[in-house]
Swiss-Prot record:
Alphabetical list of NCBIfam families matching this protein: BADH, PRK13252.1
Function, as annotated: Involved in the biosynthesis of the osmoprotectant glycine betaine. Catalyzes the irreversible oxidation of betaine aldehyde to the corresponding acid.
UniProt gene name: betB
Name the UniProt record assigns to this protein: Betaine aldehyde dehydrogenase
Keywords: Metal-binding, NAD, NADP, Oxidation, Oxidoreductase, Potassium
Amino acid sequence: MPRFPDQLLYIGGRYVPARGGHTFEVVNPATGEVLANVHNADADDLDAAVDSAKAGQRHWAALTVVERSRILLRAVALLRERNDALAELETLNTGKPLSETRSVDIVTGADVLEYYAGVAQALQGVQVPLREGSFFYTRHEPLGVVGAIGAWNYPIQIALWKAAPALAAGNAMIFKPSEVTPLTALKLAEIFTEAGLPDGVFNVLPGDGASVGHALTEHPEIEKISFTGGTATGRKVMASASSSSLKDVTMELGGKSPLIVCADADLDLAADIAMMANFYSSGQVCTNGTRVFVPRALRTAFEARLLARVQRIHIGDPLDERTTFGPMVSAAHMQRVLEHIEQGKAEGARLLCGGERLRDGALAQGCYVAPTIFSDCTDVMTIVREEIFGPVLSLLTYDDEDEAITRANATSYGLAAGVVTPDLSRAHRLIHRLEAGICWINTWGESPAPMPVGGYKQSGVGRENGLATLQAYTRTKSVQVELERYASVF
């Protein structure tokens, strides 16, 4: 018997059953417990959601910026008021420790919504005189109905990252959460309605890519798609969006990000950063710094510091406040991570710790993979080249700065990068040469609301967060005004 009742679609400000009658199970990855049967949307449901969104968007866009901002700020207050309950639901669905979801997931999502509610007034056009009797002005107009597809690792945070700028700019959004972790996106829809968002302005369609995701990307009345997920899927989404109606797209995709530890680095600080860049959220973070470059002479000392810190990881029940490391999000994903680990062993990487599924006691019921560190890695190894999206750190050695930069950039990805050094001149010199969209110096992982987030190369297109993203949910209209009598040449 599932813990929760059946979860329906959210269309037009209320819950409705899927027209096709199909459902899928959502499972707690820490225990294997079935949490709920979720209705699976299809193309017919999408058409209903689009009709609802079009009607709601006209009302929403007609409100003043101040009126829209007040509603969004009421949603912020409700999110913060219900932080603990939402965090517990997120933990049950994702397996992430409650200590994380309470302090990060809802908090940072609400921060982004508050940010866009505050800066929406910045959508101002320009007025430019052309001559004494003529000028033009520009205005930013909402796109209309936009679509978004979320990832499974930060379900409610990603939903808010995508909804906040879209709604602040006057659009309606149809959001498809990951079929693995759809529960909190539905709660977010409830909160938006309670806050006063017009019906249809935020619709949620759970379901898989084949039944509703593809239909969303190719629907002719959806003006933009924002997608977070793997690069291979991102290519398909982009192709579908462009071939159907030349939709604008934002893509936040995969990464294999480098963390460069410089020869003058504080090794304790560097080890702390490397641990957070690899084992936070059990390694299921797109920006993880999984390729850790350390000077050859410091390898042994650095390995010792990493191993000491692995001993401090508290693996267990995600609902236990002491837990700092939970399971993989699903059995299928756990298997993919374990296959990469076995490939690392087969290709000659030296296993320092972990490298196996955890089966002790209650952990056997869940999808737990031990924190894993490989040393003596080379650039051609599969674990160094491919995104694993799990708790697997690859340690590589280098001899000089130029070598480190060249090898760090030798990837098709370009999402994130980091440098650890007390010499800020060196830090900036290295960062400016690294081919990545998000870079950190002597820290890792923070993405505040005003900071644009996105990748180079095959790690993405466009940006999430920041002022430019608000503008990306609008189109610019140019209007020329002639004050004097128009002079025709005919």
